[in-house]
A protein has these predicted regions:
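Boundary-flanking segments of nucleic-acid-binding domains in nuclear regulatory proteins
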Residues: 1-260
Length: 260
């Protein structure tokens, strides 16, 4: 646990903490519309105070945009996005989201800017995107889950083979722009494009259920396949799912409801 220190000489917007190991950290923060916003930790007091002053400048100057941000190296890019969205749209998100009229952008880096439908706003405002190799993940169900799984893509999907971005932008995950070419066994996008339907072919297609994510639908299909394989001595193929741990898979498998 870190212990806060009160220091009258510390510049405004900066406070000092010490870790249990005795390391000194300089944290910066700013207040906007009665909301206290952390700007992160810095190696020294000067850098922390500069981050605070830069944050104030961003909040008070509507002419400063993300395109101008190369001039403000003192403030972390993620924090700049959060502050500009709060300034321009009056809404605070803990992730680097900037709202547009009928979609939103998630600014991972200045070069990597995702575009999502508004219906995905709640999810990505509470799930931080990370990059590992050439793939993008969020922490969900206690594991790293590919962001593509939310849109019906298999883990480690390859553009051109498993999906196609219609406008050519590989970061534009709006459903109107994403054509899924290869998905999980027994999983299709719902007609309203707000979730996923799991189904299995018996004498015809039998609906297993409606699910918010493709991952849940794929696990529901596996559960239905297991039941039918045992009950009717069938040999339905199963989805190979390696994006969550065995423990998490079992938790979802055991709790998921089927409409069979």
């Amino acid at each position: 646990m870190s212990k806060s220190e009160n220091n009258a000489k510390t510049p405004k917007g900066v406070y000092i903490t010490r870790t249990a190991a005795g390391k000194t950290l300089y944290r910066a923060s700013v207040t906007k519309a009665s909301r206290h916003i952390s700007l992160g930790s810095y190696p020294d007091e000067k850098k922390a105070h500069k981050a605070y002053l830069t944050a104030l400048k961003v909040l008070e100057n509507n002419s400063i945009s993300l395109d101008d941000f190369q001039d403000f190296k003192a403030l972390k890019y993620e924090k700049a996005v959060i502050l500009m969205n709060l300034r321009d749209n009056g809404i605070y998100f803990g992730t680097p989201i900037y709202l547009r009229k009928d979609y939103f952008n998630y600014h991972l880096t200045p070069e990597i800017v995702f575009t999502f439908d508004l219906e995905d706003l709640f999810y990505f405002s509470s799930h931080k995107i990370s990059k590992r190799g050439g793939h993008f993940f969020v922490a969900d169900y206690g594991s790293q889950v590919s962001i593509g799984s939310r849109f019906g893509l298999k883990p480690y999907s390859v553009e051109g083979r498993d999906c196609r971005f219609i406008n050519g932008d590989p970061y534009d995950y709006r459903r109107s722009n994403l054509e899924v070419l290869n998905t999980y066994h027994g999983v299709i996008v719902s007609p309203d494009q707000k979730g996923y339907i799991a189904r299995i072919h018996t004498s015809g297609y039998t609906k297993i259920g409606f699910y918010e994510s493709a991952l849940e639908a794929a696990i529901a299909y596996n559960k239905a396949a297991d039941i039918l394989n045992k009950k009717e001595n069938k040999n339905y193929p199963e989805n190979y799912i390696d994006e969550v741990s065995g423990k998490v898979y079992a938790e979802i498998y055991n709790s998921i409801k089927l409409d069979l």
